[in-house]
Amino acid sequence: MWSRKSAMLGSMAVAMYLLGLTLRNSQLVTIAVVIFVFLTWAALFGGHADVASSGRRAEEWTGEEGVALGSVLAMRKLSGSRIFEDGELTVTLRMQNNSGLAKILEVRDRVPEVMRIKEGSNYILMELGPRRETYIEYTLECPLRGFYSIGPVAVRVQDPFGLFHKEKEMHVYNDFLVFPKMEDLKDTFVKSRVPKIFTGAVNIRQPGPGSEFYSLREYFEGDSFRAINWSAYARSGKLMVNERERDAVSDVIIIIDSRAVSETGPVSRNALVYSTRAAASLAKYFLGRRDSVGVVVYGDEVVSVDRDTGKKQLYVILTKLAGAVARGNIPLQVVVNRILPHINKGSPIIFLSNLEDDPTIVNALRDFRARDFDVTVLTPSSLEFEFDAKRLDRTGYEVMKTERDVLIGELRGLGVNIMDWEPDMLLSTALAGARGF
């Protein structure tokens, strides 16, 4: 590819050649021919013509293997593969020149558009000596959840005279996952007494798996040796085992609306962003109380995470939430009809939605209430996001706000605990308001 310098030289040579022919000046023609010869030599033998591109994804590398661009090698390392929103990711790009000649390189590492470079730079223009290497290090700030990939590496190799260059993309990629950030609900819940609503693991005064001591009994074949009470054995001369008081674990179902309408508003401030963060925070809280948590995300399809407990369940839920995309328009009634037969009676239901463009919401939540489910609805208002971004005028806002208030009042009349979640309101505040605290 011609650079600006080579284009100017070429244009000048053409002008001198034509002028020499017109004036019959052999000196101008000779100079023009010399320039043409020099440009031809630089283009063919200037040291940049060994460019070739091939590569593999980063997870296929072994050892110090990278992706080669002729005699130039690129390798990339990330400080982590899983981070939370607003977290930082350090990227180190290693460039090597394995040839015996110096290379003038222009390197740009492609990063996702939503990422912000907080420190350093993903671009460098340098002369890399023969059999030398250099490192490009920069820090990304990751404001939004999702699956992301860094790459490819765009490289421009110039000849020593700066006349020509060739550009190629080195197909080296690194994938990473950004989880939705979570709000710590532990202290806030205790202050607002919300945990009384969601009871968590409760002792029911029956023997079984649990943490609290229940009674002593004689050892039977098959009992765990860890359960043997050696002090009781020393006193009685019989093998005795400890029985624990069985814990009853509540099932909590979290439903997230990820239809196309949930992305109404700015990219970083919309109903889906708030809903995924709330779902992550609630899942962490309930799993910390040894509850069994299940998640349902619906948009163009219904994606569910079966109820389970423990840290592994939290990771599964966070991964599903990170991959939630706003698309489709499945009605809530379809979701309720599908999951209703599989939910234990009395399970708390938490529904996260902006309540827009779905005429089945009232009937769907009525079905839950008719079966005596405890339903809590947190509804991030897309109207507020649009109005704050000045995409909605005052008159339109007031009309749509009135319609929304009527819908919320109708749901309250069904016995649904509901809160209009304003953009600057903490999750703990919104949840306490929904529960009437």
For every predicted segment, state its role.
Residues 4-7, 189, 198, 207, ...:
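Exposed, interaction-prone extracellular/peripheral surfaces
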Residues 1-64:
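An extended acidic
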Residues 36-308, 348-351, 367:
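An amphipathic, basic-hydrophobic helix/alpha-beta surface used to engage anionic
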